[in-house]
UniProtKB/Swiss-Prot annotation:
Belongs to the helicase family. AddB/RexB type 2 subfamily. The keyword DNA damage applies. Despite having helicase-like domains, this subunit does not have helicase activity. It holds the Pfam family ADDB_N. This is ATP-dependent helicase/deoxyribonuclease subunit B. It is an enzyme of class 3 (hydrolase). InterPro entries: ADDB_N (IPR049035), DNA_helicase_suRexB (IPR014141), P-loop_NTPase (IPR027417), PDDEXK-like_dom_sf (IPR011604), PDDEXK_AddAB-type (IPR038726), Restrct_endonuc-II-like (IPR011335). It comes from the Bacteria. It comes from Streptococcus uberis (strain ATCC BAA-854 / 0140J). Its cofactor is Mg(2+). Heterodimer of AddA and RexB. The gene is rexB.
Length: 1086
């Protein structure tokens, strides 16, 4: 064995390649071993350093792959065990274990995260050369559960003839048997890039040391560090401990070698300054101007600005002659940056490769399998059928057809096998009695889904090969492959490559399932669960089509001298250094206790114990990753959390490397900021979209004027337009063309009292409801609208019944007649919940109707339609529920309400309570048209309710209870003062609601003023997002948050403030304000 080390300014790979060539030229077979994460890059680097740029005697690989070279044809043929097969086997094992066998983990049997933890523990134990019984655990019940699970897994592996040992363990067994002595005698193993071995790797090294021609292990250590006796906290602590342990174990002295090629002195000086800092020695080295040019620290506002500035600098470097493959981008937090790196690099036309496997779990193919399995498991649940259809892999239906089908399922609340097995018949009807859903088309989709799924789900328990064939036949019947191809072809080229990799993984999972379970008797439900679980656990990786791309990866996977230009992003205190804390089914404490019990060839790696020395070595590798220029960057805000610079960066700053504060990407850095056409266009768009935070210099203004003219010509040539973007709460005015069609000048504007209320509640709500015509989704389950319609119909029948029979009989008969109508049978007979609602409505109808006999009025008409015109500009349509007549001949209006509603003069003034005045105006106009002087007594609401009383409030059960009960069943609204004596004997609440004829006229005139003012604003076509507020602190109007993104605490300034007056001055004050407004005094305040 040879142990080599060299200074960081040298190329360790160059030194080790020279060693490899010497052995290869002497006839030995050389395996050049690199860590798993670096093997691809290392292979390219080794080839670049070979004298002839290639050699059949030198193989660059990993430990596991080297093992396969030797054992592929030497051992008994057994099935290889990959992660997906292991996942399916764990699912099968857990499925068969009962609650008595698993006391702790039984509830997690089907949990995907738990199964992944089991897979990770299985591989960790293989790497540690340990079994589950060897682990010291604090909770014995938990250990017993894990022993039960892994024992059952071992039996399954043996039964299915899987290789239970890892490839390294099989390799070691072959070495011990002597089968490989002849080959290993001419084999040299060169190991590069390691600062520690796992227990399994260390055991393999021990075996190879006895059989191989030579083992060469190299690492980076400075001559100064290697001479130190005390190395705790040293920058090279990890590699020093690594070599010294090997030196002691194998009684070999470490040798220092220097390479022919050395890298820039800037990085060497910086490394020696860091080394002196951590070994507490003195040095005369200082930071020169060359170092400041080669190593830069950038402080950024946030991660978006950080990536933007990096992209702009990359474009500049490309203009200086660098190629994409010369550039490496390192990320401090891959999860936080990967979603933003792609779009920004695409904007700047920077091809990149992020060497990170992507999970299949969010791909539509996995969603299809998940929905299919859930549909089988949960008996045709509505949500699963919808998701299955939306995956677009079951049938060739348009998006519109899928949306209509989903809308109908939600409306009719279709759930379960029985509901899907028969034709859908329930439907909605509009006012013209037109059907709301095209049931012919919807039933065609239902028939297609049901026929294929029902045929597929009929499968019984059978052999795995048969059940898989049945599944493949189902995919063939629904033309699954064509559907997948059709969806993929509509995607970008990159997404198509991802789809291809996903498809490969899917077919590989099906192949693994067949190989494992072809002779096993399984149910269809278990089969789908096993395939789905493997797909959810699967990862895929897209390989770039060209090598000339910018490499992007995590900074802790870098090695020294990787690329010419290196940009390290996200180097905050939180992520640099990283604090690794292992999570899983066993704790670090349990790992440590287990290690105390076993030797070095049987132990766990505990990352948390080695965090410090590993982080120092990672920082050293990062600071020497570039050969020309290194940019170290950190944002002040990351993931919406305020961050500060890494301690390592602060240390470099203390040496004299300045921190460059990169401000927000403005438009001043012209010569460096414009890298290509797309980035120029994006900045011009930003210039037009955002208000400038600073004045531009004359030179900058001239530049952007010229660029604007150029880009406008380019856009015009391509027939593209540049839409102007407003702030997130701003709305655009409707175009004149739309207004001319929607509101022709020669036609009056059609409004209703409810539309007027909606307009004053929030103008944008009026736009959505009455301009765009958006409606709430219908449901077969009745809501307040249906309840109100039902009660209206009952009262209509009661009032129309003029027979001389007991009033209670009239009510009962009216209820029965209403219940027989098709509309109400649809809503109130579909299920137990709707039938319960019907019983409550019947009680309300009986209670509310009980005041009809004691009301001293005559009903003149019901459900009377009217049309009212204001100055030929507004046409108001509506329906009056009931018109009553007193004994003196005066008439009034009754409007039924399913909720507590009163006439409030303050809300009326603010445009929120115009119904009763509108109805009074309509009745007044009707009477005038008959050439009769109108004689009105008022307009009122009747709250339809079944009053509940708290009997604890009464000492005696006497007439006061009945009096209190009927006090809640009263008419409330607007009453004429002159009719007071005729109303006194009825159930009318007249307190504070009596108006003189002059006051009533004032109300009606102001009501007309509200309609005309709204008409003028609506015809202007600009609808504001302005829900109303009563107190200036809370918003009462409909905010429509899901559409407008209105936030009360941020956007309160856009809310419409209602005018309020003190209670004592309320009536007189608002009547006075109405007169002033109609005279033009305060028109703009409403």
């Amino acid at each position: 064995m040879k142990l080599l080390y060299t200074d960081i300014e040298n190329s360790l790979t160059e030194i080790l390649v020279q060693e490899a060539e010497v052995f290869a030229n002497s006839g030995a077979r050389v395996f050049y071993i690199a860590p798993n994460s670096l093997s691809f890059e290392k292979e390219r680097t080794v080839l670049e350093h070979l004298t002839k740029e290639s050699s059949f005697s030198i193989t660059v690989t990993r430990f596991a792959q080297m093992a396969r070279y030797f054992t592929l044809n030497k051992q008994k043929a057994q099935k290889s065990l990959d992660d997906l097969s292991l996942t399916m086997l764990f699912h099968l094992v857990l499925h068969d274990l009962s609650q008595n066998e698993l006391t702790i983990y039984h509830a997690l049997k089907s949990d995907q995260t738990f199964i992944k933890q089991l897979v990770d523990l299985f591989k960790e134990m293989q790497s540690a050369n340990l079994t589950i019984a060897d682990i010291e655990m604090e909770n014995l019940a938990r250990k017993e559960d894990l022993i039960t699970i892994f024992s059952a897994l071992s039996r399954e592996l043996l039964r299915y003839d899987f290789q239970q040992m890892s490839s390294l363990a099989v390799f070691q067994e072959a070495i011990r048997s002597g089968l490989l002595d002849q080959e290993l005698a001419k084999t040299v193993v060169i190991i590069d890039g390691f600062t520690r071995f796992s227990a399994e790797e260390e055991s393999l090294i021990h075996q190879l040391h006895q059989k191989c021609q030579e083992i060469v292990i190299g690492t980076y250590i400075s001559s100064k560090a290697m001479k130190q006796n005390f190395t705790k906290g040293n920058l090279y602590e990890a590699s020093i401990d690594f070599l010294r342990q090997l030196s002691v174990t194998y009684q070999v002295k470490s040798l220092y070698l220097s390479g022919e090629k050395t890298f820039k002195n800037s990085f060497t000086t910086m490394s020696r300054l860091l080394e002196s800092q951590y070994d507490y020695s003195l040095t005369e080295l200082t930071i020169s101007e060359d170092i400041k040019n080669d190593v830069q620290i950038w402080q950024q506002l946030n991660q978006k600005e950080e990536i933007e500035n990096i992209a702009r600098d990359i474009r500049q470097k490309l203009n200086e002659g660098y190629r994409y493959k010369d550039i490496l981008v390192l990320l401090g937090d891959v999860e936080a940056y990967q979603l933003q790196v792609g779009p920004i690099f695409d904007k700047y036309d920077i091809p990149y490769y992020l060497g990170k496997a992507e999970s299949m779990s969010h791909h539509p193919l996995v969603q299809f399998m998940d929905s299919l399995e859930n549909c089988r498991r949960y008996n045709w649940r509505k949500e699963d059928i919808i998701n299955l259809l939306k995956s677009r892999m079951l049938g060739d239906f348009t998006i519109r057809e899928c949306d209509q089908f989903e809308s109908y399922l939600n409306y009719a609340d279709i759930n379960g096998f029985t509901a899907f097995s028969k034709d859908f018949t329930a439907n909605t009807f509009n006012q013209k009695n037109e059907k709301g859903y095209d049931l012919d088309k919807i039933n065609l989709i239902r028939k297609y889904l049901f026929s294929h799924l029902n045929q597929f789900f009929k499968s019984r328990a059978q052999k795995g090969s048969n059940i898989l064939n049945h599944f493949l036949q189902f995919l063939s019947d629904i033309d699954f492959v064509s559907s997948f191809q059709r969806l993929s072809q509509k995607q970008s080229a990159l997404q198509q490559e991802k789809d291809e990799e996903v498809w490969k993984s899917f077919t590989s999972i099906l192949e693994s399932f067949y190989n494992i379970f072809k002779d096993e008797t399984l149910t269809q439900e278990l089969t789908l669960m096993l395939i789905k679980s493997a797909m959810q656990a699967a990862d895929y990786r897209v390989v770039p089509a060209t090598l000339d791309v910018v490499s992007v990866k995590s900074y802790d996977l870098v090695e020294p001298h990787s690329k010419s230009l290196v940009y390290a992003l996200g180097l905050t205190r939180t992520h640099f250094p990283k604090t690794v804390q292992q999570t899983g089914l066993i704790s670090d404490q349990e790992r440590a206790k287990t290690n105390e019990k076993w030797d070095s060839h049987h132990r766990f790696d505990i990352s948390s114990i080695e965090n410090s020395k590993k982080n120092h070595y990672t920082a050293l590798s990062l600071f020497n990753a570039a050969t020309d220029k290194l940019v170290l960057s950190y944002p002040m805000v990351l993931n919406e959390v305020v961050e500060e610079a890494s301690p390592y960066l602060k240390l470099l700053h203390s040496f004299g490397i300045p921190i460059v504060e990169k401000q927000k990407n403005t438009f001043s850095d012209l010569e460096n900021g414009i890298g290509n056409y797309k980035s120029l266009l994006s900045q011009w768009i930003a210039l037009n979209q955002e208000p400038l935070t600073e004045e531009l210099y004359q030179e900058e203004k001239s530049f952007w004027l010229v660029m604007s003219r150029y880009l406008k010509k380019q856009l015009a040539a391509k027939k593209l337009t540049f839409p102007e973007q407003k702030s997130h709460l701003a709305t655009s005015r409707l175009s004149p063309e739309v207004l001319a069609i929607k509101y022709p000048d020669h036609q009056p504007l059609s409004l209703s009292s409810s539309a007027l209320t909606v307009y004053h509640d929030n103008q944008y709500k009026y736009f959505l409801q009455y301009v765009l015509g958006l409606q709430e989704l219908e449901s077969i389950h009745p809501d307040a609208r249906h309840h109100g319609t039902y009660l209206h119909r009952v009262f209509e029948y009661v009032v129309d019944d003029q027979r001389s029979i007991p009033f209670d009989d009239k009510i009962e008969e009216a209820i029965q007649r209403t219940n027989q109508e098709r509309l109400f049978q649809t809503y109130y007979q579909s299920d137990a919940e709707s039938r319960f609602s019907l019983s409550l409505l019947e009680d309300i109808a009986k209670s509310t109707a009980s005041i009809f006999p004691i009301t001293p009025t005559k009903v003149l008409s019901q459900e009377e339609r009217f049309q009212l015109h204001f100055d030929e500009k507004v046409r108001v349509n509506g329906i009056i529920d009931r018109i009553d007549q007193l004994d003196d001949g005066s008439i009034g209006i009754v409007d039924y309400k399913s909720s507590q509603t009163v006439f409030d003069i303050g809300k009326f003034y603010n445009g929120l309570n115009s119904q009763l005045p509108t109805y009074l105006e309509a009745l007044n106009t009707r009477e005038k048209s008959k050439d009769m002087p109108p004689q009105l007594f008022g307009a009122m609401y009747l709250h339809m309710q079944d009053p509940k009383m708290d009997l604890n409030e009464f000492k005696l059960f006497d007439d006061k209870v009945v009096e209190k009960l009927y006090s809640r069943l009263t008419y409330k609204g607007i009453f004429l003062e002159r009719e007071k004596e005729h109303l006194a004997s009825g159930a009318y609440q007249m307190k504070s609601n009596l108006y003189s004829e002059e006051e009533l006229r004032n109300l009606l005139d102001y009501n007309q003023f509200l309609y005309l003012k709204a008409e003028k604003e609506i015809r202007a076509g600009h609808f504001l997002i302005n829900p109303y507020t009563e107190d200036g602190k809370t918003v009462k109007g409909d905010q429509l948050k899901a559409i407008t993104r209105f936030e009360a605490d941020l956007d309160l300034g856009q809310a419409r403030m209602l005018l309020k007056l003190p209670t004592k001055e309320k009536r007189e004050g608002f009547l006075k304000l109405m007169k002033e407004d109609m005279k033009g005094g305060k028109k703009d305040e409403i």
